[in-house]
């Protein structure tokens, strides 16, 4: 499975999501994207119109939500 993590600086749950994805044994590719370096606020509004928190996570090209949803998917 491929996981894309859209993050912001100093985001604890963004870092936790990256660690979880990298160490789960279920993910073959992790892309960690930082706002400002890899995408803009406008991109977030377009990709995740209802999002209000970070990280925003995409699994195999499908937005799933945030850290809690990733944890549920990988550990459930």
Question: Which role fits each region the language model picked out?
Answer:
Residues 12, 39, 65:
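Short alpha-helical
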Residues 7, 27-41:
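Thiol-based oxidoreductase modules, predominantly thioredoxin-like and allied folds used
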Residues 59-76:
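Non-catalytic, surface beta->alpha helical segment in thiol-disulfide oxidoreductase systems
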């Amino acid at each position: 499975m491929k996981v894309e993590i859209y993050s912001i600086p100093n985001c604890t749950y963004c870092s936790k999501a990256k660690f979880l994805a990298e160490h789960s044994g279920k993910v073959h590719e992790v892309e960690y994207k930082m706002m400002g370096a890899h995408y803009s606020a406008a991109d977030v509004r377009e990709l995740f119109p209802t999002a209000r928190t970070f990280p925003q996570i995409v699994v195999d090209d499908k937005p799933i939500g945030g850290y809690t949803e990733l944890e549920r998917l990988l550990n459930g």
